[in-house]
């Protein structure tokens, strides 16, 4: 039950895996396509799988440093074995003393225990300075104290065996594997062969192999003499000590071969010495390795920017360095919580940041939505390689093709030039000669131009210049405001008091009333005058008719 609990997936990791599975139900759209972005100076350099991990699995590896020789060959190997044994004791005694001092610092009194615990740590490091990592290592060492004691009770049987690899389970709280790199050599060379070897050859072969192993031990523990028990051993050091037998422990702890190659480069598999016994030459190391959950539908996409030509000068695109995509959602990924390898990201937590609609539109292929910053310096490399091809700003540097010979020119308005093996086989840039083997397919957009509205300033010097211009504009506006105030000051304030305003209003109303009355009177007089004119005209016409009638009569 105890060994099974050591490999159980922790609750936080299980919760993260369930979240990842839920996200995996979202149907994936096409991944971030860098081909339309290359001509705009935005290059997708690669993808990495995103994994979540926690360091929770532990197991012990007991390294048998002194091999058992066959009875008929003990006399021949006695001299090199005795010299090897003395050297081992000299090399590893500081390690054993350091482990013993830290483990003996544990007492039953809480406060006393803490003081002795810290004192043991400070006493075992150079200059009395204990780092957080060393305190953590010491804490782990004390927690493994009981397991180390149980291993020591079995030391005689472990030392007496001729097996190169076997499990040790009697009374141990976690998986333990006893391995012997030198015992493996002895078994292969002497125990499992019928070939007769003379004593001189046996002495020579054993001596050479023991010296080589001592060299590896010195490489592992030599730099750690100042604080030997508090420095973690890397996976490379563990393989040096245990040889290929290290795989047996890792496999027992549930680490598959498909994960092993990636985890080796991550540095997440570490070991801490927990015991050293000089009598039997046994070295115990507690191995810690992570529980890893793979987020199947999440990967990190890395972006790089190349200097591009604009009408405002040279600039670079404002895009995140790393983005992640799940379904149709693209967000910036914070990798400060992650450990990177060539193919994977191992993160203790996933932290993402939303992007503005403009950047999102830019990364999905709409290059007219991309924004650029005039922050590229004169020494910035104006080119980058991509899968055997080159993306270069041929306005900043001379793009000279050696095969076929010629100069590659960049058309007016183009941001960068896409150069592949179809346009040039051997390219020379700033004295660097590159042989091109890749090609840009039809999906790579060309002749992309950057508009003035897409270029902004973000550099300190550029911002200072813009602030200076803004300050000048503000100063001019203040001068105009002062002139306006001076003109307003010349106005007689006494004419603008309350009583004067009331008088002005009353006079204005009276004037309006008089004007209206005058207009009405004028209209009345005009109407009356027209009526009189009509009456006179009628009388005249009537008199004329009477005179005509009289004349006819």
From Swiss-Prot:
Segments on the Extracellular side according to the record's topology features: 32-500
Region (Fusion peptide): 117-141
Cystines in this chain: 76-199, 338-347, 362-370, 394-399, 401-424
Keyword Lipoprotein: yes
Glycan-modified residues: 85, 191-192, 366, 447, 471
GO BP, one annotated term: fusion of virus membrane with host plasma membrane
Lipid positions (S-palmitoyl cysteine): 523
Mod. after translation: The inactive precursor F0 is glycosylated and proteolytically cleaved into F1 and F2 to be functionally active. The cleavage is mediated by cellular proteases during the transport and maturation of the polypeptide.
Coiled-coil residue spans: 142-170, 466-491
Residue spans, topological domain Cytoplasmic: 522-553
Record field: transmembrane: 501-521
Membrane topology value: Single-pass type I membrane protein; Single-pass membrane protein
Gene3D superfamilies: 1.10.287.2480, Head and neck region of the ectodomain of NDV fusion glycoprotein, Newcastle disease virus like domain
Keywords: Cleavage on pair of basic residues, Coiled coil, Disulfide bond, Fusion of virus membrane with host cell membrane, Fusion of virus membrane with host membrane, Glycoprotein, Host cell membrane, Host membrane, Lipoprotein, Membrane, Palmitate, Signal, Transmembrane, Transmembrane helix, Viral envelope protein, Viral penetration into host cytoplasm, Virion, Virus entry into host cell
Keyword set includes Membrane: yes
Residue(s) at site: Cleavage: 116-117
One of the record's GO cellular component terms: virion membrane
Localization in the cell: Virion membrane; Host cell membrane
Protein name: Fusion glycoprotein F0
Gene name in the database record: F
């Amino acid at each position: 039950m105890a060994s099974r609990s050591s490999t159980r997936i922790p609750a936080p990791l299980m919760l993260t895996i369930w979240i990842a599975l839920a996200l995996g139900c979202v149907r994936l759209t096409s991944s971030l396509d860098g081909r339309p972005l290359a001509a705009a100076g935005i290059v997708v350099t690669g993808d990495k799988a995103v994994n979540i991990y926690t360091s929770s699995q532990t197991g012990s590896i007991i390294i048998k440093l002194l091999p058992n020789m066959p009875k008929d060959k003990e006399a021949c190997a006695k001299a090199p074995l005795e010299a090897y044994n003395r050297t081992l004791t000299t090399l590893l005694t500081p390690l054993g003393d350091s482990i013993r001092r830290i483990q003996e610092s544990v007492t039953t009194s809480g406060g006393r225990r803490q003081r002795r615990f810290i004192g043991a740590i400070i006493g075992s490091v150079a200059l009395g300075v204990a780092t957080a990592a060393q305190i953590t290592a010491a804490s782990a060492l004390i927690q493994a104290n009981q397991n180390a004691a149980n291993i020591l009770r079995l030391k005689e049987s472990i030392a007496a065996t001729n097996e190169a690899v076997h499990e040790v389970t009697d009374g141990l709280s976690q998986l333990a594997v006893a391995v012997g790199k030198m015992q493996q050599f002895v078994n292969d060379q002497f125990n499992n062969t019928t070939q007769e070897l003379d004593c001189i050859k046996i002495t020579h072969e054993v001596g050479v192999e023991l010296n080589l192993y001592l060299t590896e031990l010195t490489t592992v523990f030599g730099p750690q003499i100042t604080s030997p028990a508090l420095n973690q051993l890397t996976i490379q050091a563990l393989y040096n000590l245990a040889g290929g037998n290290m795989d047996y422990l890792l496999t027992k702890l549930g680490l598959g071969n498909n994960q092993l190659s990636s985890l080796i480069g991550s540095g997440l598999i570490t070991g801490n010495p927990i015991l050293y016994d000089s009598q039997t030459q046994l070295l115990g190391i507690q191995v810690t390795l992570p529980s890893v959950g793979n987020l199947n539908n999440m990967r990190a996409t890395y972006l790089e920017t190349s200097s591009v030509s604009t009408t405002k000068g040279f600039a670079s695109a404002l895009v995140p360095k790393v983005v992640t995509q799940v379904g149709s959602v693209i967000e910036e990924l914070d990798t400060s919580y992650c450990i990177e390898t060539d193919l994977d990201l191992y993160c203790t937590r996933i932290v993402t940041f939303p992007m503005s609609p403009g950047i999102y539109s830019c990364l999905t292929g709409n290059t007219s939505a991309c924004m650029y910053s005039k922050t590229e310096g004169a020494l910035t490399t104006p080119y980058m390689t991509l899968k055997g091809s080159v993306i270069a700003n041929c306005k900043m540097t001379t793009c000279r093709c050696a095969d076929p010979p010629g100069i590659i020119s960049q058309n007016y308005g183009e941001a960068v030039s896409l150069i592949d093996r179809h346009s040039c086989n051997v390219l020379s840039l700033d004295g660097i000669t590159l042989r091109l083997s890749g090609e840009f397919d039809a999906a790579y957009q060309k002749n992309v131009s950057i508009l003035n509205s897409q270029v902004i300033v973000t550099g300190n010097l550029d911002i200072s210049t813009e602030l200076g211009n803004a300050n000048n504009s503000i100063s001019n506006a203040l001068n105009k405001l002062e002139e306006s105030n001076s003109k307003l000051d010349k106005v007689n304030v006494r004419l603008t008091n309350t009583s004067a305003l009331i008088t002005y209003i009353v006079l204005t109303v009276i004037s309006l009333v008089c004007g209206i009355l005058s207009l009405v009177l004028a209209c009345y007089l005009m109407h009356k005058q027209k009526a009189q004119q009509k009456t006179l005209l009628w009388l005249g016409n009537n008199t004329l008719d009477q005179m005509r009638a009289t004349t006819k009569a």
